């Protein structure tokens, strides 16, 4: 059973990366600069930390800022521990794989830590969910697109497997005071 699960996961990761490579080949001149900008914004969670700190300045957004900062702190610790515990190599690590050639085509964005879970996606999920739970419910569901877009960029550049991104979303832990 365990081998079946691993084979299914690897097949899913490969199929989704293959699809991303097709997107790159067909729409890369349009998509790549936009997605590169988005993924750079997510480096070290910097944009999410800055926005959370800005939210602290205003009474109306202070709750969202506090929730987001706490979630981001928990996320950094959890992601760091999980990356070491799982020790999954990046998709491009095996130079004889499709992933490696796709990574080169996508611009060979360099990443040095382990792959699972996606730290960018975890931070984006923490930030998006923090805003979701602390804002007007009528429109707050739009904040949930933040992790989807960030996760998409990480798979597009072949720096993460699809399952790394899913892990980043699922790993999210919220202090969620309501």
Q: Where are the language model's segments positioned?
A:
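Short helix-capping/hinge motifs at transmembrane helix termini and TM-loop junctions
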Residues: 58-59, 87, 158-161
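Transmembrane-embedded, aromatic-rich helix segments that form part
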Residues: 47-50, 165
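Membrane-embedded catalytic cores of phosphoryl/pyrophosphoryl-handling enzymes
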Residues: 102-174
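Interfacial segments of alpha-helical transmembrane regions
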Residues: 54-78
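Positively charged, low-complexity/disordered segments
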Residues: 176-178
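N-terminal transmembrane-helix/juxtamembrane module of multi-pass inner/ER membrane proteins
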Residues: 1-48, 81-109
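Membrane-helix interface segments
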Residues: 28-31, 60-65, 135-141
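Membrane-water interface at transmembrane helix exits
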Residues: 55, 79-87, 132
